[in-house]
Amino acid sequence: MTRTIGAVLGVLLLAGCAAGVGEPKPGAPAHHRRGGFANVDASHPHASGWTRWTFFLSRVLAAIFAPRSVTLPAVENDGAALRANREFPTVTWVGHSTLLVQLDGVNVLTDPQWSPRASPVSFAGPRRLNEPGLAFEALPPIHVVVISQDHYDHLDVDTVKRLAATHHPRFLVPLGIKEWLAALGITDVEELDWWDARDVRGLTLTCVPAQHFSGRTFWDRNRRLWSGWTVAGRTKRLFFAGDTAYYGAFREMGQRLGPFDLAAIPIGAYLPPEIMKAGHTTPEEALQVMLDVRGARMLAIHWGTFDLAEEPLAEPPERLERERQRLGLEPDRVWVLKHGETRQW
């Protein structure tokens, strides 16, 4: 126990006290900095290093001495229908921000995470509260993987190595992550800046802005870019927000790349606001993101899988439903899937 506490506190101390990046780079886009990247909207400043440190310390102690759990309904999904599907656009919620998206015969994974923990160590850190909704072995052939950022709940070493070894997909990542993947032996990678696009197997995938931050160690805070993604096929468009706070750029995304048939938007990890508001949306803000990007429907992600914040674990969809009713939106416009559930979109 002492070893576990010491290791985790050391990791979190490094993360909480991490240094930022340098000044703007002359002639470069506004989010580029010397040595890394920055948000262009300063309306949600990040908490101080000390505030972050004390929060994460409290989370570590709570996880050790008072771990929380929640049992959420799941759908048994053996993947057979997904492996046979070549025609219908579908989306399957594996858990957290991991989606299997099928569009025009192409299989896309977002932020794949199949590990028991979202952590740099196997014996501590946020543990998975519910099993992945689709077993890794049940996946159809994966053609494309998109990564939104380098945090442990979105970029998992074991999962991406396993995908590269068994499925050989094309990885599309924000700036700075290609080199990190190359160190793992993963080389079929293209890294993109905000608003860059690539055509893969007939789909157009665009890297879009997000309001967040990055870093896996003491030394690399904001050294790699963070983003969302859009996926456009012959007749359907999907928006994947990644991990983000609410800010005004979503309206521009909707104008430039929308409308979207489905918008996958995070609804969890929003309390306490002094820590979380700079990088995460509340359920209420998530619905505003859907409206801003001109989404026909919203799919709730980033909740019910890892215990990352202080809100009750089952609260995010409850708040989402109350806000949907307040806005007068039709129930079918807001999807809260069970782990493993597949829907056509």
Task: List PLM regions with ranges.
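Positively charged n-region of N-terminal signal peptides that target proteins for export
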Residues: 1-4
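Metallo-beta-lactamase
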Residues: 14-138, 173-242, 261-268, 319-344, ...
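Bacterial N-terminal signal peptides
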Residues: 6-15
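Catalytic core of the metallo-beta-lactamase
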Residues: 98-102, 199-261, 277, 281-285
